[in-house]
Amino acid sequence: MADCGDEADEAGAQAELSDKEKKDIAVWFLSNAPVGEISYVAKDIRTLIGDDRLYDMAASESFPRHNKAHLLTLELPDRSGDVIITGYGEIDKNQYLEPRSAQVATVDHIKQACTGLRPATDDELPSPYIEEFRYALDVELCKYVAEAYPKGISAVYCTRGKDIDVPGNDFDLVAIISASKKSPQNFCNGSWRSIWTFEFKDDTQLVDIKGKIQIAAHYFEEGNVQLSTKNEFNDSTVFQSPEDCAVQLTNIVRHHESEYLQSLEASYLHLPDSMFKDLRRKLPVTRTLFPWHNTLQFSINRDLSKELGIGK
Amino acid sequence: MEAALDLMRRISPKKSETALSALLSLLPHYSSDLLSQVDLPLQVSTDTTSMKDFLLCEYNRDADSYRSPWSNTYFPPLEDGPLPSEELRKLEVEANEVFSIYRDQYYEGGISSVYIWEDDDHGFVACFLIKKDGSKTGQGKRGNLQEGSWDAIHVIEVNPEEDGTAHYCLTSTIMLSLATENKTSGTFNLAGSIRRQMSLDLSVEEGHLCNMGRMIEDMESKLRNSLEQVYFGKTREMVCTLRPPPEGVQICIPESRPI
């Protein structure tokens, strides 16, 4: 009887779940979808919400955010390369600049596909002066990405001062590296995202470097295990010619990323001893299996130590 | 229901509480199914009579109160809250005592609780719970973890047979989350949950507690290994796939499959 009452109450509560609450729930699940799995999450949540209008609202809000946050890469319709979905290349909510080929891709966020391509206008591209720096860095970075990432995609954007056409001014470039592996048939997905910001400063003649790397991995065969890591870096180098800057900046990126990978390996190596052991040991402190057959002994010992006032 | 469970294996285990409460509000008619199929990290309460902590689950709950295994009373107080039979309570007391020692030996800290109650048939069900905070601010002896939680839930159905044996069916869930943070490696976060089942027919000569204890010990060790070797190994493999370590220093990853 009590159960029936509870259920009736809860059913009543459901009726009060407003459209906004339902949509918020859908947005929450979509926003927390692991990399490469948003379409599966979308399918589930669409079924559960049972209201396509609300689902569409949630999807049109969540997919662009998810695609940008995960630096989704999409193949261009002419197969000439890939465009990275990132705020740094966003022209409007469905158009993204691909700086290497100076094209703008039209993107369907929910289908996660490029639907169109046009040449970028002059307004959308940096000045020839800035382009020299951007282009040189892109070339060097491409070489590095090709050698370090089996499936890495990179792009370099000018995010400040793109119209500067003479030396003597500050400007910023941002380099993005995005590598992902989707293998739903093997129950695993993962991604590596690097964002490197280079601030070219005229007064100090230095380039300030800020980096952020995030890695995510999800393995879910008969379980659910997720890795997420994040690290930030700061560095600087001398403001030089476009070519020299490109080589120097790429070396710095390579150095930090390799070091970071090594520190991750070290974390994994320490996992069994120093980390896992603080949760549960592999063997008891006695280093032998627990003597279940002899537990009476424990009770006696415990009583004895209690009486003698020793132990716990 | 299928869609709901699929979501639960996709959303990070660190966010399972929010995910479950969202699903419960969306699917009130499936609340008991969801609650029985989705495990969450355990909550702790204090038995103010014995001044000892105990763990909360559906099996020691009645209305909004939970029965403590130490004093056998409900907190907050509840009149007429169901209690196990005298015979089962005796086993429960012993199980709690022995399981505390087991927990201390494997976990070097933590909280454990055992609840036993009559089954519909002639058998009984026992639920063994362990919670450990292994972070450096908690009970992590080595102090390497910024955050480290381990929750184990073992539910074991026991059906004694005529011939002096009993059928034991164990369902175990382990949930864990660990995080380290330092200058060179930034934040490193691993979270996971797995659930497995195992059934055995055993002679009750040495007693139920002995049989249940051995099964749980065996299962916990298997699940721990599986998480450490297979599941965490797979995430490491993924990192190496995305950006392989330079040749020469490549550390070989053993091919492994989950149990």
Annotate each language-model stretch with its function.
Chain A
Residues 29, 63, 133, 171, ...:
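Phenylalanine-focused residue identity feature
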Residues 222-271:
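Short secondary-structure boundary motifs at beta->alpha junctions and helix caps
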